[in-house]
Amino acid sequence: MMGAFDWRDRRLIVATSKTKRSADFIDFLEKLDHLYGPKPGQCQRPVVIVLDNGPIHTSKATKAALATRAHWLSIEWLPKYAPELNDIENVWRDLKAHFLAHQTFTDTDFLDQAIHSAVETLNLERKQNPLVNQRISA
């Protein structure tokens, strides 16, 4: 499971795959291209993606894919072994604890379906209650 959290819209964007390889992450970047990449005739919003130093984020293929997006996508690298600094980790924790806990999935297709359903519900809740789980900036 890979995801991005849109702080402006408070929306979680998720992609699931059976593998966790650079090609899967690059596919996710293409999804972000479609959602946030520059569009003709529109003002470009700044987009920042925060990445840990996992192998799928640091491979040659991924670095090349990130370089082609450098004109609209800024990368912030987290220090190694510091998941507490990654805000999406809290979202994953909430997703697992409140939507996926105490369930058994017979195969990955059912798990994928449950994840996407949980994300839809979480996004709807965050849209209806914008102050829920909102971090207060220091």
Feature map (PLM): residue ranges:
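Acidic/histidine-rich, metal-coordinating catalytic segments
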Residues: 41-57, 81, 86
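Generic structural signal for small/hydrophobic residues in well-ordered secondary structure
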Residues: 3-4, 10, 29, 52, ...
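C-terminal anion-handling pockets and recognition modules
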Residues: 88-138
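Electropositive, glycine- and tryptophan-enriched low-complexity nucleic-acid-binding patches
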Residues: 1-44
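Conserved protein kinase catalytic core
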Residues: 12, 58-59
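RNase H-like polynucleotidyl transferase catalytic core
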Residues: 67-87, 104
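Distinct, well-ordered alpha-helical segments
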Residues: 62-64
